[in-house]
Amino acid sequence: MSAETVILGAGIIGVSTAYYLSQHQDPSSIHLVDPSPELFSSASGYAGGFLAKDWFGPALAPLGALSFEEHRRLAEEHGGREKWGYSPATCFSYAASAAARESAKRGDDWLRDGTSRADAAPLAFDDAGSGKTPTWLRRVDGDHLELISDEGTTAQVDPLRLCQFLLRECLARGVKLYHPAKPASVVTHDFGNGDELIGVNIDRLEAGEPLTESLLLPCTRLIITAGSWTGQVFRTLFPWSRLEIPIRSLAGHSLVLKSPRWHAGLEGNGCHAIFTTHDGGFCPEMFSRIGGHIYFAGLNSSSLPLPDAEKGKATPYDESLAQLREAARQTLGPAGGGGGVAAADDDNDLEIVREGLCFRPVTDWGKPIIARIPDEEIGAGIVTRAGANGGVFVAAGHGPWGIAMSLGTGIVLAEMVQGRKTSANVSGLAFFG
């Protein structure tokens, strides 16, 4: 008989975990719980969707390689190009001037922090003949485009559509979804060896309304995949614990736009990822996607307050959006009349499709937590069943790599929970408080 399993947080990590758990246990014993009235309304749905195979340091390298290969395999098996825009990608670092190239950090440095991968040597390209250079990027005299990825080591997805696919598959198998709903308390029973975890009380919600219903979900296995809210969820359920789950948030504004210079006729050569710098003091990142869209972001802040998860989609800040729109116009707008001169300021043919603000879960040490919490850290004498029959687990803090690491995390976490040998060594991601 499958151990009842509750997953708190139905973002990309939660639905990936449910997807792989349901391959090896009765799907009806898996319960997904999420407080947002609109699923995937934060980092899972508003991320860039950039995938990398080998941009990671030793602790993350095995998980990165596993996840990258699983993204490829899943897309190949389920028509990922059509269903969620999976495509190989070519990555570049871009400097608009020689001065910017010499004085500024590379635009991809923040992504490479802690990696053991050596910087790629600069390569010169003939834009007219390469076929894999981004024709949608505005080029100016004196700029520099540097290849920073090896062929076959980076890719692109639309994260919202990937999340929706995984959730559809879970529900079709029989996984249960409760949303909007939030955890209220754990339920225990003394079987003679301490107060054993046997369930979670959840409060079912209606958007903007008070509590409408309380429900007990029986479980002996509890998984917290609540992104930036993971620490809050743990504290709600285990207020007596001395353990703090140190997940904080990194807020990021983003745009999804259309450009007449990126269209279906160009998608056969794959998508692009471009990292650059901007004189506004931030590092724009832009990713072309299958379907004619370009994702533009890079304006991040660790000081924006984390909203209540049950309020759903966060409201972007007008000033930040205006700054992004101007940077997008400067970087992606039409070229001028020739000679590599930029177009006039009022000449903008970019169409804004979506604007967003999301909150990425991060740790101070730059690596996610994927671990079972020891019973002694839970406190109050609460115990969980041994081995694959029980446990409290946490998976969060993936930072800018949540989508890239999602499938590998789902595989490994499902294996940990079910007592199977893990497909990647994630011992370096354990957490001991």
Name every feature range the model reports, one short phrase each.
Residues A3-H31:
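N-terminal Rossmann-like FAD-binding beta1-loop-alpha1 element of flavoenzymes
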Residues I13, E38, W229:
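Conserved Rossmann-like nucleotide-cofactor binding loop
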Residues Y19-Y20, G45-L51, W84-S87, R221-G390:
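Active-site substrate-recognition segment that forms the wall
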Residues E77-H78, K83-P180, S185-E196:
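Flavin (FAD/FMN) cofactor-binding and adjacent substrate-gating region
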Residues A3, S16, P374-G433:
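C-terminal lid/capping helical subdomain adjacent to the catalytic/cofactor pocket in oxidative enzymes
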Residues Y20, S29, P35-C91, A96-R106:
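Conserved FAD-binding subdomain of flavin-dependent enzymes
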Residues T154-H263:
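Predominantly flavin-linked oxidoreductase catalytic cores and closely associated redox partners
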